[in-house]
Amino acid sequence: MSRYWSDIVQQLVPYVPGEQPALAHPVKLNTNENPYPPSPRVVAAIARELGETGDTLRRYPDPVARALRETVATHHRIKPEQVFVGNGSDEVLAHTFQALLKHDRPLRFPDITYSFYPTYARLYGVQTSNVPLADDFSIRVDDYLDDAGGVLFPNPNAPTGRALPLADVERIVAANPSSVVVIDEAYVDFGAQSAITLIDRYPNLLVVHTTSKARSLAGMRVGFAFGEAALIDALNRVKDSFNSYPLDRLAQVAAQAAYEDTDYFNATCRRVIDSRTRLTHALDALDFNIVPSAANFVFARHPAHDAGAIAAKLKEREIFVRHFRLPRIDQHLRITVGTDAECDALVAALRELLA
Protein backbone atom coordinates (compact mmCIF):
# COMPACT_ATOMS: atom_id res chain seq x y z
CA MET A 1 0.00 0.00 0.00
CA SER A 2 1.17 3.51 -0.80
CA ARG A 3 0.05 6.92 0.39
CA TYR A 4 -0.37 7.80 -3.29
CA TRP A 5 -3.09 5.22 -3.81
CA SER A 6 -6.63 6.50 -4.31
CA ASP A 7 -9.39 5.37 -1.96
CA ILE A 8 -10.84 3.03 -4.56
CA VAL A 9 -7.50 1.31 -5.17
CA GLN A 10 -7.09 0.71 -1.45
CA GLN A 11 -10.48 -1.00 -1.38
CA LEU A 12 -10.03 -3.19 -4.46
CA VAL A 13 -9.64 -6.96 -4.29
CA PRO A 14 -8.20 -7.69 -7.75
CA TYR A 15 -9.13 -10.71 -9.81
CA VAL A 16 -6.58 -13.53 -9.56
CA PRO A 17 -6.08 -15.31 -12.90
CA GLY A 18 -5.17 -18.96 -13.21
CA GLU A 19 -1.50 -19.82 -12.94
CA GLN A 20 0.56 -19.63 -16.13
CA PRO A 21 3.41 -22.06 -15.38
CA ALA A 22 6.81 -21.28 -16.89
CA LEU A 23 7.50 -24.91 -17.74
CA ALA A 24 8.44 -26.59 -20.98
CA HIS A 25 5.63 -29.14 -21.14
CA PRO A 26 3.05 -28.77 -18.36
CA VAL A 27 -0.29 -30.52 -18.46
CA LYS A 28 -2.18 -27.25 -18.21
CA LEU A 29 -5.80 -27.85 -17.27
CA ASN A 30 -6.41 -24.78 -15.11
CA THR A 31 -7.44 -21.86 -17.35
CA ASN A 32 -9.98 -23.36 -19.79
CA GLU A 33 -7.90 -22.76 -22.89
CA ASN A 34 -8.72 -24.79 -25.97
CA PRO A 35 -6.35 -27.76 -26.29
CA TYR A 36 -6.26 -27.41 -30.07
CA PRO A 37 -4.71 -24.66 -32.21
CA PRO A 38 -6.79 -22.09 -34.07
CA SER A 39 -7.93 -22.67 -37.62
CA PRO A 40 -5.12 -22.71 -40.22
CA ARG A 41 -6.98 -19.82 -41.84
CA VAL A 42 -6.14 -17.73 -38.78
CA VAL A 43 -2.42 -18.27 -39.21
CA ALA A 44 -2.69 -17.50 -42.93
CA ALA A 45 -4.68 -14.32 -42.28
CA ILE A 46 -2.08 -13.04 -39.82
CA ALA A 47 0.70 -13.78 -42.31
CA ARG A 48 -1.15 -11.89 -45.05
CA GLU A 49 -1.71 -8.91 -42.78
CA LEU A 50 1.95 -8.76 -41.82
CA GLY A 51 3.26 -9.26 -45.35
CA GLU A 52 7.01 -9.44 -45.84
CA THR A 53 7.83 -6.28 -43.92
CA GLY A 54 5.01 -5.82 -41.40
CA ASP A 55 4.42 -2.37 -42.86
CA THR A 56 0.72 -2.40 -41.97
CA LEU A 57 1.60 -2.32 -38.28
CA ARG A 58 2.65 1.32 -38.49
CA ARG A 59 -0.98 2.21 -39.24
CA TYR A 60 -3.72 2.36 -36.64
CA PRO A 61 -6.31 -0.42 -36.90
CA ASP A 62 -9.94 0.14 -37.86
CA PRO A 63 -11.40 1.63 -34.65
CA VAL A 64 -14.80 -0.02 -35.20
CA ALA A 65 -13.51 -3.35 -36.61
CA ARG A 66 -16.02 -3.04 -39.43
CA ALA A 67 -15.04 -6.14 -41.44
CA LEU A 68 -14.96 -8.32 -38.33
CA ARG A 69 -18.32 -7.03 -37.10
CA GLU A 70 -19.90 -7.72 -40.49
CA THR A 71 -18.53 -11.27 -40.55
CA VAL A 72 -19.71 -12.01 -37.02
CA ALA A 73 -23.11 -10.44 -37.68
CA THR A 74 -23.55 -12.64 -40.74
CA HIS A 75 -22.55 -15.70 -38.73
CA HIS A 76 -25.19 -14.98 -36.08
CA ARG A 77 -27.80 -13.68 -38.56
CA ILE A 78 -28.01 -10.25 -36.98
CA LYS A 79 -27.03 -6.72 -38.04
CA PRO A 80 -23.53 -5.21 -37.67
CA GLU A 81 -24.97 -2.41 -35.54
CA GLN A 82 -25.98 -5.11 -33.03
CA VAL A 83 -22.34 -6.14 -32.55
CA PHE A 84 -19.75 -4.57 -30.22
CA VAL A 85 -16.11 -5.65 -30.35
CA GLY A 86 -13.65 -5.33 -27.48
CA ASN A 87 -10.20 -6.38 -26.35
CA GLY A 88 -11.39 -9.69 -24.90
CA SER A 89 -14.74 -10.35 -23.27
CA ASP A 90 -13.35 -9.10 -19.95
CA GLU A 91 -13.02 -5.62 -21.42
CA VAL A 92 -16.50 -5.95 -22.92
CA LEU A 93 -17.82 -6.83 -19.46
CA ALA A 94 -15.95 -3.91 -17.90
CA HIS A 95 -17.54 -1.49 -20.37
CA THR A 96 -20.92 -3.11 -19.68
CA PHE A 97 -20.59 -2.43 -15.96
CA GLN A 98 -19.81 1.21 -16.69
CA ALA A 99 -22.38 1.75 -19.41
CA LEU A 100 -25.40 -0.31 -18.42
CA LEU A 101 -25.27 -1.78 -14.92
CA LYS A 102 -24.72 1.11 -12.50
CA HIS A 103 -28.18 2.16 -11.35
CA ASP A 104 -30.09 2.79 -8.12
CA ARG A 105 -30.94 -0.89 -7.70
CA PRO A 106 -28.43 -3.67 -7.08
CA LEU A 107 -27.05 -5.86 -9.83
CA ARG A 108 -27.86 -9.51 -9.17
CA PHE A 109 -25.59 -12.43 -9.98
CA PRO A 110 -25.02 -15.92 -8.53
CA ASP A 111 -23.00 -16.40 -5.37
CA ILE A 112 -20.85 -18.92 -7.24
CA THR A 113 -19.86 -17.46 -10.58
CA TYR A 114 -17.09 -15.76 -12.55
CA SER A 115 -15.04 -13.95 -9.91
CA PHE A 116 -14.37 -10.93 -12.13
CA TYR A 117 -17.97 -9.76 -11.58
CA PRO A 118 -17.52 -8.59 -7.97
CA THR A 119 -14.15 -7.09 -8.92
CA TYR A 120 -15.75 -4.93 -11.61
CA ALA A 121 -18.59 -4.03 -9.27
CA ARG A 122 -16.16 -2.69 -6.67
CA LEU A 123 -14.09 -0.88 -9.31
CA TYR A 124 -17.08 0.92 -10.82
CA GLY A 125 -19.15 1.37 -7.66
CA VAL A 126 -21.99 -0.92 -8.72
CA GLN A 127 -24.29 -2.16 -5.96
CA THR A 128 -24.61 -5.95 -6.02
CA SER A 129 -26.74 -8.72 -4.58
CA ASN A 130 -25.45 -12.29 -4.54
CA VAL A 131 -28.15 -14.85 -5.30
CA PRO A 132 -27.38 -18.33 -3.92
CA LEU A 133 -27.29 -21.21 -6.34
CA ALA A 134 -29.29 -24.32 -5.48
CA ASP A 135 -27.54 -27.15 -3.68
CA ASP A 136 -26.83 -28.83 -7.03
CA PHE A 137 -25.24 -25.56 -8.25
CA SER A 138 -28.08 -24.81 -10.67
CA ILE A 139 -29.46 -21.29 -11.09
CA ARG A 140 -32.93 -21.01 -9.58
CA VAL A 141 -34.86 -19.11 -12.22
CA ASP A 142 -37.57 -17.95 -9.81
CA ASP A 143 -34.95 -15.96 -7.88
CA TYR A 144 -34.58 -13.60 -10.87
CA LEU A 145 -38.21 -12.96 -11.83
CA ASP A 146 -39.01 -9.91 -9.70
CA ASP A 147 -37.59 -7.10 -11.91
CA ALA A 148 -35.61 -5.79 -8.93
CA GLY A 149 -32.45 -4.70 -10.75
CA GLY A 150 -29.94 -5.77 -13.38
CA VAL A 151 -29.07 -9.43 -13.88
CA LEU A 152 -25.76 -10.98 -14.91
CA PHE A 153 -24.75 -14.62 -15.13
CA PRO A 154 -22.69 -16.92 -17.33
CA ASN A 155 -24.48 -19.59 -19.31
CA PRO A 156 -23.00 -22.14 -18.90
CA ASN A 157 -22.05 -20.92 -15.45
CA ALA A 158 -18.44 -20.77 -14.36
CA PRO A 159 -16.89 -22.47 -12.51
CA THR A 160 -19.71 -25.02 -12.23
CA GLY A 161 -20.36 -25.70 -15.92
CA ARG A 162 -24.12 -26.00 -15.49
CA ALA A 163 -26.30 -24.45 -18.20
CA LEU A 164 -29.83 -23.09 -18.23
CA PRO A 165 -32.12 -24.03 -21.13
CA LEU A 166 -32.86 -21.13 -23.46
CA ALA A 167 -36.50 -21.09 -22.35
CA ASP A 168 -35.41 -20.37 -18.77
CA VAL A 169 -33.03 -17.64 -19.92
CA GLU A 170 -35.90 -16.05 -21.82
CA ARG A 171 -38.12 -16.17 -18.73
CA ILE A 172 -35.51 -14.16 -16.82
CA VAL A 173 -35.07 -11.62 -19.62
CA ALA A 174 -38.82 -11.20 -20.08
CA ALA A 175 -39.39 -10.75 -16.34
CA ASN A 176 -36.91 -7.86 -16.05
CA PRO A 177 -38.00 -5.30 -18.66
CA SER A 178 -36.80 -2.29 -16.65
CA SER A 179 -33.20 -3.53 -16.32
CA VAL A 180 -30.46 -4.91 -18.53
CA VAL A 181 -29.95 -8.67 -18.41
CA VAL A 182 -26.44 -9.76 -19.41
CA ILE A 183 -25.75 -13.36 -20.40
CA ASP A 184 -22.04 -14.17 -20.47
CA GLU A 185 -21.74 -17.00 -23.00
CA ALA A 186 -18.00 -17.65 -22.91
CA TYR A 187 -18.60 -21.43 -22.94
CA VAL A 188 -21.87 -21.64 -24.87
CA ASP A 189 -20.40 -23.48 -27.87
CA PHE A 190 -19.66 -26.60 -25.82
CA GLY A 191 -23.24 -27.59 -25.14
CA ALA A 192 -25.63 -24.73 -24.33
CA GLN A 193 -28.10 -22.67 -26.37
CA SER A 194 -27.20 -19.08 -27.21
CA ALA A 195 -29.52 -16.24 -26.30
CA ILE A 196 -28.40 -14.23 -29.34
CA THR A 197 -31.58 -15.46 -31.03
CA LEU A 198 -33.56 -13.40 -28.50
CA ILE A 199 -31.98 -9.97 -28.94
CA ASP A 200 -34.47 -8.76 -31.57
CA ARG A 201 -37.34 -9.45 -29.16
CA TYR A 202 -35.85 -8.05 -25.96
CA PRO A 203 -34.27 -4.56 -25.94
CA ASN A 204 -32.91 -5.21 -22.41
CA LEU A 205 -30.81 -8.25 -23.39
CA LEU A 206 -27.04 -8.16 -23.89
CA VAL A 207 -25.12 -11.32 -24.78
CA VAL A 208 -21.33 -11.48 -24.36
CA HIS A 209 -19.03 -13.82 -26.31
CA THR A 210 -15.31 -14.51 -26.56
CA THR A 211 -12.93 -16.09 -29.06
CA SER A 212 -10.72 -17.39 -26.24
CA LYS A 213 -12.46 -20.73 -25.74
CA ALA A 214 -14.11 -22.41 -28.71
CA ARG A 215 -12.06 -20.54 -31.32
CA SER A 216 -8.66 -21.06 -29.66
CA LEU A 217 -7.71 -17.38 -29.61
CA ALA A 218 -7.05 -16.72 -25.92
CA GLY A 219 -3.74 -15.15 -26.93
CA MET A 220 -5.36 -12.59 -29.25
CA ARG A 221 -7.94 -11.03 -26.85
CA VAL A 222 -11.14 -10.59 -28.86
CA GLY A 223 -14.60 -10.38 -27.30
CA PHE A 224 -18.08 -9.33 -28.40
CA ALA A 225 -21.39 -8.07 -27.12
CA PHE A 226 -24.66 -8.56 -28.98
CA GLY A 227 -27.80 -6.55 -28.36
CA GLU A 228 -30.08 -3.87 -29.71
CA ALA A 229 -28.34 -0.88 -31.28
CA ALA A 230 -29.00 1.41 -28.28
CA LEU A 231 -27.13 -0.93 -25.92
CA ILE A 232 -24.25 -1.26 -28.38
CA ASP A 233 -24.11 2.53 -28.73
CA ALA A 234 -23.74 2.83 -24.95
CA LEU A 235 -20.76 0.47 -25.04
CA ASN A 236 -19.20 2.41 -27.90
CA ARG A 237 -19.56 5.66 -25.96
CA VAL A 238 -17.60 4.15 -23.08
CA LYS A 239 -15.03 2.59 -25.41
CA ASP A 240 -14.41 5.87 -27.23
CA SER A 241 -13.98 7.63 -23.89
CA PHE A 242 -11.34 5.09 -22.89
CA ASN A 243 -9.56 3.65 -25.95
CA SER A 244 -10.73 4.21 -29.51
CA TYR A 245 -8.46 1.45 -30.85
CA PRO A 246 -8.98 -1.54 -28.54
CA LEU A 247 -8.46 -4.24 -31.14
CA ASP A 248 -5.18 -4.41 -33.06
CA ARG A 249 -4.88 -5.31 -36.73
CA LEU A 250 -3.72 -8.88 -36.17
CA ALA A 251 -6.49 -9.64 -33.70
CA GLN A 252 -9.12 -8.33 -36.12
CA VAL A 253 -8.02 -10.46 -39.07
CA ALA A 254 -7.42 -13.49 -36.85
CA ALA A 255 -10.90 -13.37 -35.34
CA GLN A 256 -12.50 -12.80 -38.73
CA ALA A 257 -10.72 -15.84 -40.18
CA ALA A 258 -11.74 -17.94 -37.18
CA TYR A 259 -15.40 -17.07 -37.72
CA GLU A 260 -15.18 -17.80 -41.43
CA ASP A 261 -13.93 -21.36 -40.87
CA THR A 262 -17.11 -22.90 -39.49
CA ASP A 263 -16.11 -26.46 -40.38
CA TYR A 264 -12.96 -26.25 -38.26
CA PHE A 265 -14.87 -24.58 -35.44
CA ASN A 266 -17.56 -27.26 -35.38
CA ALA A 267 -15.02 -30.08 -35.52
CA THR A 268 -12.97 -28.62 -32.67
CA CYS A 269 -16.03 -28.18 -30.46
CA ARG A 270 -17.06 -31.77 -31.18
CA ARG A 271 -13.62 -33.04 -30.14
CA VAL A 272 -13.75 -31.13 -26.87
CA ILE A 273 -17.27 -32.37 -26.10
CA ASP A 274 -16.28 -35.97 -26.82
CA SER A 275 -13.20 -35.61 -24.61
CA ARG A 276 -15.33 -34.09 -21.85
CA THR A 277 -17.55 -37.18 -21.89
CA ARG A 278 -14.51 -39.43 -21.79
CA LEU A 279 -12.94 -37.49 -18.91
CA THR A 280 -16.21 -37.46 -16.97
CA HIS A 281 -16.45 -41.26 -17.19
CA ALA A 282 -12.82 -41.63 -16.06
CA LEU A 283 -13.32 -39.36 -13.05
CA ASP A 284 -16.54 -41.11 -12.16
CA ALA A 285 -14.63 -44.41 -12.10
CA LEU A 286 -12.32 -42.82 -9.50
CA ASP A 287 -15.36 -41.98 -7.33
CA PHE A 288 -15.40 -38.23 -8.06
CA ASN A 289 -18.75 -36.45 -7.83
CA ILE A 290 -19.10 -34.46 -11.03
CA VAL A 291 -21.41 -31.55 -11.80
CA PRO A 292 -23.09 -31.95 -15.22
CA SER A 293 -21.12 -29.72 -17.59
CA ALA A 294 -21.98 -27.90 -20.81
CA ALA A 295 -18.59 -26.17 -20.87
CA ASN A 296 -15.00 -27.11 -21.78
CA PHE A 297 -14.27 -28.11 -18.20
CA VAL A 298 -15.63 -30.33 -15.47
CA PHE A 299 -16.27 -29.38 -11.86
CA ALA A 300 -15.66 -32.27 -9.50
CA ARG A 301 -15.04 -33.23 -5.90
CA HIS A 302 -13.80 -36.40 -4.26
CA PRO A 303 -15.72 -37.40 -1.12
CA ALA A 304 -12.64 -38.83 0.62
CA HIS A 305 -9.81 -36.47 -0.38
CA ASP A 306 -9.17 -32.75 0.13
CA ALA A 307 -9.36 -30.81 -3.13
CA GLY A 308 -6.54 -28.43 -2.24
CA ALA A 309 -4.25 -31.32 -1.40
CA ILE A 310 -5.06 -33.05 -4.68
CA ALA A 311 -4.32 -29.87 -6.64
CA ALA A 312 -1.00 -29.40 -4.83
CA LYS A 313 0.09 -32.99 -5.46
CA LEU A 314 -0.85 -32.73 -9.12
CA LYS A 315 1.18 -29.54 -9.40
CA GLU A 316 4.24 -31.42 -8.13
CA ARG A 317 3.80 -33.61 -11.22
CA GLU A 318 3.45 -30.52 -13.45
CA ILE A 319 -0.27 -31.10 -13.87
CA PHE A 320 -2.28 -27.93 -13.21
CA VAL A 321 -5.97 -27.78 -12.27
CA ARG A 322 -7.93 -24.92 -10.65
CA HIS A 323 -8.81 -24.94 -6.97
CA PHE A 324 -10.93 -22.13 -5.50
CA ARG A 325 -10.65 -21.42 -1.77
CA LEU A 326 -14.19 -20.08 -1.62
CA PRO A 327 -17.27 -20.96 0.42
CA ARG A 328 -19.33 -23.89 -0.89
CA ILE A 329 -16.75 -24.91 -3.51
CA ASP A 330 -13.47 -25.26 -1.63
CA GLN A 331 -13.65 -29.05 -2.03
CA HIS A 332 -14.12 -28.89 -5.78
CA LEU A 333 -11.63 -28.84 -8.63
CA ARG A 334 -12.27 -27.21 -11.98
CA ILE A 335 -10.53 -29.28 -14.62
CA THR A 336 -10.17 -28.03 -18.19
CA VAL A 337 -10.84 -30.59 -20.89
CA GLY A 338 -7.46 -31.07 -22.55
CA THR A 339 -6.37 -33.39 -25.31
CA ASP A 340 -7.07 -37.05 -24.68
CA ALA A 341 -3.36 -37.50 -23.91
CA GLU A 342 -3.46 -34.70 -21.32
CA CYS A 343 -6.61 -36.09 -19.74
CA ASP A 344 -5.05 -39.56 -19.65
CA ALA A 345 -2.01 -38.13 -17.84
CA LEU A 346 -4.30 -36.47 -15.31
CA VAL A 347 -6.34 -39.61 -14.70
CA ALA A 348 -3.21 -41.75 -14.33
CA ALA A 349 -1.79 -39.32 -11.76
CA LEU A 350 -5.08 -39.22 -9.86
CA ARG A 351 -5.26 -42.99 -9.82
CA GLU A 352 -1.87 -43.10 -8.10
CA LEU A 353 -2.59 -40.23 -5.71
CA LEU A 354 -5.93 -41.60 -4.57
CA ALA A 355 -4.77 -45.19 -4.12
From Swiss-Prot:
Query: What keywords sit in the KW lines?
Result: Amino-acid biosynthesis, Aminotransferase, Histidine biosynthesis, Pyridoxal phosphate, Transferase
Q: Which reaction does it catalyse?
A: L-histidinol phosphate + 2-oxoglutarate = 3-(imidazol-4-yl)-2-oxopropyl phosphate + L-glutamate
Q: InterPro entries, per this entry?
A: Aminotransferase_I/II_large, HisP_aminotrans, PyrdxlP-dep_Trfase, PyrdxlP-dep_Trfase_major, PyrdxlP-dep_Trfase_small
One molecular function GO term is: pyridoxal phosphate binding
Amino-acid biosynthesis keyword on record? yes
Q: Which residues carry this modification: N6-(pyridoxal phosphate)lysine?
A: 213
Q: Could you tell me the EC number(s) of this protein? A: 2.6.1.9
- Identify which cofactors the protein needs according to its UniProt entry: pyridoxal 5'-phosphate
Keyword DNA-binding part of the UniProt annotation: no
The record's top EC class is: transferase
Q: Which Pfam families match?
A: Aminotran_1_2
SUPFAM superfamilies registered for this protein in UniProt: PLP-dependent transferases
Q: In which pathway does it act?
A: Amino-acid biosynthesis; L-histidine biosynthesis; L-histidine from 5-phospho-alpha-D-ribose 1-diphosphate: step 7/9
An individual GO BP term:
L-histidine biosynthetic process
Superkingdom, taxonomy of origin? Bacteria
PANTHER family, sorted: HISTIDINOL-PHOSPHATE AMINOTRANSFERASE (PTHR42885:SF2), HISTIDINOL-PHOSPHATE AMINOTRANSFERASE-RELATED (PTHR42885)
Q: How does it assemble?
A: Homodimer.
The entry's family comment says: Belongs to the class-II pyridoxal-phosphate-dependent aminotransferase family. Histidinol-phosphate aminotransferase subfamily.
Give the protein name, as stated in the record.
Histidinol-phosphate aminotransferase 2
Name the gene behind this protein.
hisC2
